[in-house]
UniProtKB/Swiss-Prot annotation:
Complex and partners: Protochlorophyllide reductase is composed of three subunits; ChlL, ChlN and ChlB. Forms a heterotetramer of two ChlB and two ChlN subunits.
PANTHER family: LIGHT-INDEPENDENT PROTOCHLOROPHYLLIDE REDUCTASE SUBUNIT N
Gene3D superfamilies, A to Z: Nitrogenase molybdenum iron protein domain
Species this chain originates from: Pleurastrum terricola (Filamentous green alga)
Name of the protein in question: Light-independent protochlorophyllide reductase subunit N
Subcellular location field: Plastid, Chloroplast
Role of this protein: Component of the dark-operative protochlorophyllide reductase (DPOR) that uses Mg-ATP and reduced ferredoxin to reduce ring D of protochlorophyllide (Pchlide) to form chlorophyllide a (Chlide). This reaction is light-independent. The NB-protein (ChlN-ChlB) is the catalytic component of the complex.
Co-factor remark: Binds 1 [4Fe-4S] cluster per heterodimer. The cluster is bound at the heterodimer interface by residues from both subunits.
Cofactors that this protein relies on: [4Fe-4S] cluster
EC numbers on record: 1.3.7.7
Listed GO CC annotations: chloroplast
GO terms for biological process, alphabetical: light-independent chlorophyll biosynthetic process; photosynthesis, dark reaction
């Protein structure tokens, strides 16, 4: 099989039949337990799940983090033990030791196989221990490990309050000073008096949340809340009049739940990754809220000017996405805007409805930069991809950890895609972090060639 890079006029979508090569989605515990500060995550699975969490998260159990393993034993699988009693014992212990505001049960492959009725047990146990229990089945049947967060957020949508739950108490007690109440309680009560409420969904570090909130405040748009919030008690109001907008491309299940269960109005916008994406994201929200964007063009130009030292390294370079975390389309669009050529965008799963705005923006970016349209390959076959990489010889391959070393041994510079998941890549100011990750292998190669001359030695031995 030979691979040639055709100059396509429109986006080309292909679907192969490859296996999914990704982390287990229960890895979402790694960042969600830190994001929701008053939560406790209980992963219900086997020893394998425990080993994975222990190694992937890098936290020893002696540190007593706010997550734990409910390890299934032979007695559980053979139905000799009562699942309800065992989970009740563990949850009572969690309540006594940590007293969280919410316990999140993370189902795994094993709970699916043995048909554990977690959704049936949770309400009964919740009423007994008086702590909310959210059930999320973040098992290995998903396409990408980032979809674990999608599953948890979709489950939390049903726990978000509705407007009538807050307005009724306020109407019943007429002597309450609502002005002082708004000042005291903040956005949860303040949003009642707005015609259009905006809720953003997606787990981001608090510093990035603040940055995006400020960008919208500059346009006179107030964010009513975030899903997830830092505290479970601060979950945003979700109702039929609320506008919602996502910040990550892997949250299609959450978006569908928001629209179907709570009748929210989804704002379809490109994702705020890179200066171009952040500007388009803010502009789309402004158009929905009837605001004229102020100073966005100038702000984007300033950011690009500050990135010039990195742009000189990547202009004219080629990149190949093997596919791992569903961020590929957004990252490819940003790198094309930086002057790179993207040969192929491999992606485990593509929700074309949720990513419609991002795909249209990718197409527009390719036209503006006068570069060929990349192929988008859904569910790529890694054997075919390796062959195409061998033929195309890209300057950089963004890949999962499993393929990085074999590609490096064949003279292809690589970057782990998982690093983009944990890095701060959203908003105007974090664009530099994306290019820092992308250019690191390129700068390493320049150093080896320029000062040490090791590249020829390596190539001669391959």
């Amino acid at each position: 099989m030979t691979a040639t890079f055709k100059k396509e006029v429109n986006l080309v979508f292909e679907c192969e039949t490859g296996n999914y090569h990704t982390f287990c989605p229960i890895s979402c515990v790694a960042w969600l337990y830190q994001k929701i500060e008053d939560s406790f995550f209980l992963v219900i699975g086997t020893k394998t799940c425990g080993y994975f969490l222990q190694n992937a998260l890098g936290v020893m159990i002696f540190a007593e983090p706010r997550y734990a393993m409910a390890e299934l034993e032979e007695g559980d699988i053979s139905a000799q033990l009562n699942d309800y009693k065992e989970l009740k014992r563990l949850c009572l212990q969690i309540k006594q030791d940590r007293n969280p505001s919410v316990i999140v049960w993370i189902g795994t492959c094993t709970t699916e196989i043995i048909k554990m009725d977690l959704e049936g047990m949770a309400p009964r146990l919740e009423s007994e221990i008086d702590i909310p229990i959210v059930v999320a089945r973040a098992n290995g049947l998903d396409y990408a490990f980032t979809q674990g967060e999608d599953t948890v957020l979709a489950a939390m949508v049903n726990r978000c309050p509705k407007k009538d739950q807050l307005t009724k108490p306020l109407q019943a007690v007429s002597f309450i000073d609502t002005d002082s109440l708004q000042k005291e309680k903040g956005p949860k009560y303040d949003s009642i008096n707005h015609d259009k409420d905006l809720v953003l969904f997606g787990s981001l570090p608090s510093t990035v949340v603040t940055q995006l909130n400020l960008e919208l405040q500059r346009q006179d748009i107030k964010v009513s809340g975030w899903l997830p919030s830092q505290r479970y008690s601060d979950l945003p109001i979700l109702d039929s009049g609320v506008y919602v907008c996502g910040v990550n491309p892997f949250l299609s299940r959450t978006a569908a739940t928001l629209m179907r269960r709570r009748k929210c109005k989804l704002i379809g916008a490109p994702f705020p990754i890179g200066p171009d994406g952040t500007r388009a994201w803010v502009e789309k929200i402004c158009s929905v809220f009837g605001k004229q964007p102020q100073g966005l063009e100038q702000r984007e130009a300033e950011i690009w000017k500050g990135l010039e030292d990195y742009l000189q390294l990547v202009r004219g370079k080629s990149v190949f996405f093997m596919g791992d975390n569903l961020l590929e389309v957004s990252l490819a669009r940003f790198l094309i805007r930086c002057g790179m050529i993207v040969y192929e965008i491999g992606i485990p799963y593509m929700d074309k409805r949720f990513q419609a705005a991002e795909l249209a923006f990718l197409e527009k970016t390719c036209h503006d930069m006068n570069v060929p349209m990349p192929r988008i390959v859904e569910k790529p076959d890694n054997y075919n991809q390796i062959q195409r990489i061998k033929e195309l010889q890209p300057d950089l391959a963004i890949t999962g950890m499993a393929h990085a070393n074999p590609l490096e041994a064949r003279g292809i510079s690589t970057k782990w895609s998982v690093e983009f998941t944990f890095a701060q890549i959203h908003g105007f100011t974090n664009s530099r972090d994306i290019l820092e990750l992308v250019t690191r292998p390129l700068r390493r190669n320049n150093s080896l060639e320029g000062s040490l001359g090791w590249t020829q030695l390596v190539k001669s031995t391959v």
